[in-house]
């Protein structure tokens, strides 16, 4: 089932960025948050942003020029390269990462996203449609749910259930088009509390079911 497949995805930690980022990669929440980032960075609408998965993590960016050629950045999936780029920009400085071998990495795959199998993408698009505080709500609910999963308190699929529940609760409220920082922080705390309460209710329900 999906839970087993997602756990298998977690095994391959190419970037070595820690457990939280590993789970977000398995659930595609990292891509969901990148949809929101792209909207603000490039002033795009949700429908202008497509998502594909590149399992090998070799190509890190691509830019298509007006002659339909594509410029790409390729390297080993190693954060040391990214850090060296940030520290040295606009110059290139030597990193401690190994060189990329195109012989060893001769298979480059690109996979379309299925929103049914990966609800995180739909959550991101719904958050952009709702606007206002919803992206902050999405992020907060995910952080709590992932924390509970890492602590073996919930199953993987309940990450999605928790986020969906919290977003639906918030969707019934009024959102400001341009919320203040104070309002964003308040929504963040409220979403975290709603997530904890929802998970607690699931535990209570499961415990009651075990009695009968």
Residue ranges of model-derived segments:
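Single conserved hydrophobic/aromatic residue that forms the stacking wall/gate
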Residues: 1-7, 11, 203-212
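Conserved anion/nucleotide-ligand pocket segment
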Residues: 4-8, 12-29
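Helix N-cap / loop-to-helix initiation motif
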Residues: 24, 34, 45, 134, ...
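Internal, well-ordered alpha-helical segments in soluble enzyme and binding-protein domains
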Residues: 31-34, 59
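C-terminal substrate-binding/catalytic lobe of Rossmann-fold NAD(P)-dependent dehydrogenases
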Residues: 40-141
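C-terminal helical cap and adjacent loop that interface with cofactors, partners, or active-site loops
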Residues: 104-201
